[in-house]
From Swiss-Prot:
The gene is rnfA. Disruption phenotype: Deletion of the rnf operon abolishes growth on acetate and ferredoxin:heterodisulfide oxidoreductase-coupled Na(+) transport. This is Ion-translocating oxidoreductase complex subunit A. The chain crosses the membrane at residues 8-28, 49-69, 75-95, 106-126, 138-158, 178-198. Keywords: Cell membrane, Electron transport, Membrane, Translocase, Transmembrane, Transmembrane helix, Transport. It comes from Methanosarcina acetivorans (strain ATCC 35395 / DSM 2834 / JCM 12185 / C2A).
Length: 199
């Protein structure tokens, strides 16, 4: 039991910090740059991604292990996972549109783009490639979503704060500036690589 808890904690740390999808693996950068102009939009998008990643990890585990593997259809996993993610995103979009219309409008095109967010698909595929069981898959899905949230909120806070100061013209305020900030954030996260040995 203790070994299992240690394993889950290690997977959690990997998902949030060591294998952070945005700052270490550079997956899902479209929303990272596009939605982090203010904290409200970034937190809404992050919540949606955490939900989709956690649910996709759970549903995809069941789909892969109880349907695709017994029927020897493992080669369809990517397509099957994309369909699962798309269905979950439609559910999230429906809920957000109905209950938080202001957030729905502020997220714009980025909410449906969670379907094509490679970070979500990457998390699900890593669960299969690492041969995680259900608990490990769910923990990794939640941790990857929380890692995404940490990076999104840090970026949004920095960008909001930088609106109050003068930025050199050579750096600018658009995408160039966002990637400049992301580079510095990424370098700080690289230091986490020494915490847990990667296989």
């Amino acid at each position: 039991m203790v070994k299992m808890a240690e394993s889950l904690f290690t997977i959690f740390l990997e998902g949030v910090f060591i294998k952070n999808f945005l700052l270490i693996q550079f997956l899902g950068l479209c929303s990272f740059v596009g939605v982090t102009k203010d904290l409200k939009s970034a937190s809404g998008m992050s919540g949606a991604v955490v939900f989709v990643m956690a649910m996709a990890a759970t549903v995809s585990f069941a789909l892969y292990n109880f349907i695709l593997v017994p029927l020897k259809l493992e080669f369809l996993r990517t397509i099957a996972f994309i369909v699962v993610i798309a269905a979950l995103v439609q559910l999230v979009e429906f809920i957000v549109r109905k209950h938080v219309p202001a957030l729905y409008r502020s997220l714009g095109i980025y909410l449906p783009l969670i379907t094509t967010n490679c970070a979500v698909l990457g998390a699900v595929l890593l669960n299969v490639m690492n041969d995680y069981d259900l608990a490990q898959s769910v923990v990794f899905g939640v941790a990857a979503g929380l890692g995404y949230t940490v990076a999104m909120l840090m970026m949004a806070a920095i960008r909001e704060r930088s609106d109050l100061v003068e930025v050199p013209k050579s750096v600018g305020r658009g995408v160039t500036y966002a990637f400049f900030i992301a580079t510095i954030m990424s370098m700080s996260f690289v230091n986490f690589f020494g915490v847990i040995p990667l296989e």
